[in-house]
Amino acid sequence: MVASARVQKLVRRYKLAIATALAILLLQGLVVWSFSGLEEDEAGEKGRQRKPRPLDPGEGSKDTDSSAGRRGSTGRRHGRWRGRAESPGVPVAKVVRAVTSRQRASRRVPPAPPPEAPGRQNLSGAAAGEALVGAAGFPPHGDTGSVEGAPQPTDNGFTPKCEIVGKDALSALARASTKQCQQEIANVVCLHQAGSLMPKAVPRHCQLTGKMSPGIQWDESQAQQPMDGPPVRIAYMLVVHGRAIRQLKRLLKAVYHEQHFFYIHVDKRSNYLHREVVELAQGYDNVRVTPWRMVTIWGGASLLTMYLRSMRDLLEVPGWAWDFFINLSATDYPTRTNEELVAFLSKNRDKNFLKSHGRDNSRFIKKQGLDRLFHECDSHMWRLGERQIPAGIVVDGGSDWFVLTRSFVEYVVYTDDPLVAQLRQFYTYTLLPAESFFHTVLENSLACETLVDNNLRVTNWNRKLGCKCQYKHIVDWCGCSPNDFKPQDFLRLQQVSRPTFFARKFESTVNQEVLEILDFHLYGSYPPGTPALKAYWENTYDAADGPSGLSDVMLTAYTAFARLSLHHAATAAPPMGTPLCRFEPRGLPSSVHLYFYDDHFQGYLVTQAAQPSAQGPAEMLEMWLMPQGSLKLLGRSDQASRLQSLEVGTDWDPKERLFRNFGGLLGPLDEPVAVQRWARGPNLTATVVWIDPTYVVATSYDITVDTETEVTQYKPPLSRPLRPGPWTVRLLQFWEPLGETRFLVLPLTFNRKLPLRKDDASWLHAGPPHNEYMEQSFQGLSSILNLPQPELAEEAAQRHTQLTGPALEAWTDRELSSFWSVAGLCAIGPSPCPSLEPCRLTSWSSLSPDPKSELGPVKADGRLR
């Protein structure tokens, strides 16, 4: 009783405090319930057909001079409203949910469910203990699949030889896109589970303990000192892909010497580049192209296979008596002259130069994923489970760019030593094998004392930008990639005491000025008046590849560009020449190039066969289409002065902070990203509003920009198809404008590479169901934004959904002409049209002179540059 009375007394005394505490707890509970309800609601719409469980996230970032980062993972996202901001060294700017939206669940249209993924049940063979297929019995590695996105689930159509239980292996089987790849994965996993895939122990021949890595300094005066023996000769292995033939020619021009040898492997997917390289090699006896080609994906086992096969080829070419093997990519460039490199290697002719990770081995093994089993198929590296490092050896690794002696290459290629044979088996199922195989073989061999911990390169690592898991669509791991050099990085290229002779990476589509600076530093300036020193061209389409490599958006845009240009030729011609300047396009464009000047994108160059309206043969014309800027900076406050640019596009590259889709060509099925660039200044919170062509407010969200934030970007999860036509993105603060930009969602004239049919146009050009781009409606913002009444725009949009043929082309051309203008036309051959000058005489045509990327004959000193 006494205790009860005391409790009652305490309750009466502190009843106000207790009531306040209960109220706070109740409020917190309501908030938690509200947000969990939003997540559950989204999960109910998006999660009914769940994909296989994501891979477990790893931790940490990339190792020094190694491309591996951490285990791949999609990571969990809490709802749809997490955005990203990029700001090195400062907290991430946040995208927060706008409070101006209202829920409209009653009219929500759920997306079509994805294909049913295979179950995660155990997979068993026909009988336990059935004999396993040996490694030699595997099907060949498939060339199918795409590195543009992770392979999609398919039905199980294979027969595993054992019970597969590991979660990594089951996930890989569920995601592999072909039966052949699934069978390969099952065979590898069964062999591994039986203990017959990986070597248990590997012999070590090196008698040294610890790492043998003598430091070698470099003094430029050494290049003038007499050599010990004849100057060394180098076999350059160039591993290239993509379409940047002009940058490759520029690299070859810089490193070429008639005493060296050049062997070029072009990725199997890069047919245009292969044709150009084959033509290039015909002019030089010491330049050859591999007669075979492979698909070499980032981090894949195929890269090591390609190197070993290339090394064997180089050893067996008659008359190629080389001393060193140096691998390069098209994004490399020399930082010292050939004379300096030859002098240095001649004084160290018995050394092998490989860059090590520079940290304890156990951590490197974890970061690099060496304790995990991988297999490559469908152009993807699949993580299949854990494994043990073989006993008896020291595992090393780091960079996959190296300088190796001929004797070591012969040992790796020809030896029967169990050390090499068993390590080749181990690295066949290893992520990034070229970053570790040669290091580990050398450090455990009798030649271990020849190792120098320096690969003679300087690499532009910026891990805050380069380690963003950008390869997770190719490998089940998080990887890193170096950044491109820019002029502000030039001091890093001038290593004085450390011997470095090459640098990477360089991309002329990102920055060509730094190459000009480096080239001038090495070889001096070009003669005065040399053309095209600031210009750069890169092919993006060639008719020999066929239209299959083009998206419907690009095919639509390129053909529309040709029509706009030919119309311009007729209207811009002098009156007397008008009949001679009327053309009709014939077929599809024959080629398309990106054109840059002074490191700014200048537009597309389209080469098109055109039939004159007057009598005469068809002519080949090249047309220059230039994008028109649409950014408006509207604010007058200090916060508004922070905004530098506002862009919308696709293929955003967070490492280089640019859109790889130059010009922002996008269609109804694309997923655009809005990117803002900021100067430093006071913190601010801004609202981003997207408005479609019929004045539907598609979405609205807030971004918080910290003091030192440089870039913010967010891709709203808009329902598709997007309505074709001009869109507007506004940036506001307290509903006062800071900036505005317009972008075009292009009406498509092609669908699956065929002219658009009416039944396809009726849904592809109609916008999303019920005009709802999000699960919430933002149309209540129309009055705040002072948007026009939508009725007329809606009627026009409805008419547009019925267009096909010439009427559809006219609409597409009309919309495109609001964002692009014809900047030039020229004739590749003779033309009676007086307003068309020859392309070779222009400064902008892809056929105009480009001396910096033209090779020419070998000079008296054995060089090209």
From Swiss-Prot:
Domain of life the protein comes from: Eukaryota
Modification after translation (UniProt): Contains disulfide bonds.
Cofactor(s) demanded: Mg(2+); Mn(2+)
Biased composition (Basic and acidic residues): 53-65
GO BP of this protein: chondroitin sulfate proteoglycan biosynthetic process; heparan sulfate proteoglycan biosynthetic process
Protein name per Swiss-Prot or TrEMBL: Xylosyltransferase 2
Comment on bound cofactor: Active with either Mg(2+) or Mn(2+), but activity is highest when both are present.
Ranges of compositional bias, category Basic residues: 73-82
Keywords for this protein: Disulfide bond, Glycoprotein, Glycosyltransferase, Golgi apparatus, Magnesium, Manganese, Membrane, Metal-binding, Secreted, Signal-anchor, Transferase, Transmembrane, Transmembrane helix
Glycosylation sites (chain numbering): N122, N327, N683
InterPro entries associated with the record: Glyco_trans_14, XYLT, XylT_C
UniProt topological domain (Cytoplasmic) ranges: 1-15
Amino acid composition bias (Low complexity), ranges on this chain: 125-137
Membrane topology term: Single-pass type II membrane protein
Ranges of the Lumenal topological domain: 37-865
Subunit field text: Monomer.
GO cellular component: extracellular space; Golgi membrane
